[in-house]
Regions:
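Conserved alpha-helix/loop element of class I SAM-dependent methyltransferases that forms part
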Residues: 31-65
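Class I SAM-dependent methyltransferase SAM/SAH-binding core
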Residues: 65-121
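A short acidic, Gly/Pro-enriched loop at the edge of an enzyme's catalytic core
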Residues: 120-133
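A short SAM/SAH-binding and catalytic strip from SAM-dependent methyltransferases
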Residues: 131-146
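A short glycine-rich, Lys/Arg-flanked "PGG" loop and its adjoining helix->strand segment in the class I
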Residues: 146-161
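Conserved class I S-adenosyl-L-methionine
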Residues: 161-202
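Short alpha-helix
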Residues: 215-238
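Core SAM-dependent methyltransferase catalytic element
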Residues: 231-233, 248-266
C-alpha cells in the first residue's frame, strides 16, 4: 500500500475520495429532479439498488416505514423513499453525499435525518430501530463486510428487511489493462476475495490516489450472502442486473450487480 494510503485508515481515505466524487458529479451523486419526486409522492418506490428498478414485491409500499439508507447518500434513494411516505434516516461517510440529500430535502419539503458515519458501526441507533435497511452498492469500500451485516440485523425490527446490493465478485478477477480489452481478451489476474491494497502494485495504488479514486474490496459470495445468513438473516429474494455502460470486457458477459432481499425472522 502506498505511503499516502498508509497514513490514513481505509475509512478516512475512502471518505475523502467520495467527497471528491460527489463534487465531480459522479453517477451516484446526481440529485433526483422534481419530476421524480412528484412521481414518488404518488406512492411509487423509485429507489434503486442496481441500475434497474427494484424487483416486484421487494418494497412495493414504503408508507409509514422507518428506513435506514445505509451508505446511500447522494440525493437519490433517500429523498425518493421519503417522498413515497417513509420516515428516512441516511448514514453515509461522505459529507458531500449527505449535502446532496439535504439539497433535495430542502428543495422538495422532505424530512430526512442525516447522519455521518461508518456503515460498520450503527451504535448510535438502538436495537430494533428500523423496518428496512436500504443498502445499495457500497460495501466494496470496507475491508470486512461481516460487521455491516451484524449491525443491520441488530438495528432492524423483527420481521424487518435488508435490501442490499453489491458487485458480482467475478467482476474483480480480470486484468484491467485497456490493451487487453481492445483485443477482446479477458485475462484472470486477481483472486477472490479481492483487495486493492493487497492486489495492486505500488504504482497502481499511487495512480488510483492521483485520480482521487476510492480503495475497493471485492468480497466473496460467502462473505456477501453467507455473511447475511451468519448474521441471522433469511434470504427471501435474489436479483442480478447488468452494467448498462460496461467499463470492463467481463461486464459484457455476466451481470455485474447482485441484489438480495434478506429478512430478520419475526
Amino acid at each position: 500500500m502506498s505511503d499516502a494510503v498508509q497514513q490514513h485508515d481505509v475509512f478516512h481515505y475512502n471518505q475523502a475520495a467520495w467527497d471528491r466524487q460527489a463534487r465531480a458529479d459522479c453517477e451516484w451523486s446526481r440529485p433526483v429532479d422534481a419530476a421524480e419526486i412528484a412521481e414518488a409522492r404518488q406512492g411509487r418506490v423509485l429507489a434503486r439498488l442496481t441500475p434497474g428498478p427494484l424487483p416486484a414485491g421487494w418494497l412495493d409500499d414504503a408508507r409509514g416505514l422507518d428506513i435506514l439508507c445505509l451508505a446511500s447518500g447522494g440525493g437519490q434513494q433517500a429523498p425518493l423513499l421519503a417522498a413515497a411516505g417513509a420516515r428516512v434516516t441516511v448514514l453515509d461517510a461522505s459529507a458531500e453525499q449527505l449535502a446532496h440529500d439535504r439539497v433535495v430535502a430542502e428543495r422538495e419539503g422532505l424530512e430526512l435525518k442525516l447522519e455521518q458515519g461508518d456503515m460498520r458501526d450503527l451504535s448510535r441507533f438502538a436495537d430494533a430501530s428500523f423496518d428496512c435497511v436500504f443498502h445499495p452498492i457500497s460495501n466494496l469500500y470496507v475491508p470486512d463486510v461481516a460487521p455491516v451485516w451484524r449491525e443491520c440485523f441488530r438495528a432492524l425490527r423483527p420481521g424487518g428487511r435488508l435490501l442490499a446490493s453489491f458487485y458480482n465478485p467475478a467482476a474483480f478477477v480480470a486484468d484491467r489493462d485497456p490493451a487487453l480489452m481492445e483485443q477482446g481478451l479477458i485475462r484472470p489476474r486477481f483472486s477472490i476475495p479481492y483487495a486493492d491494497p493487497a492486489h495492486l502494485s505500488e504504482a497502481e495504488l499511487e495512480a488510483k490516489r492521483e485520480r482521487g479514486e476510492a480503495l475497493v474490496f471485492g468480497h466473496s459470495l460467502t462473505e456477501l450472502i453467507g455473511g447475511q445468513a451468519a448474521a441471522g438473516f433469511l434470504i427471501a429474494g435474489f436479483h442480478e442486473d447488468w452494467q448498462p455502460r460496461p467499463r470492463f470486457l467481463i461486464d459484457r458477459y455476466l451481470p455485474a450487480f447482485i441484489a438480495t432481499w434478506a429478512l430478520k425472522p419475526a
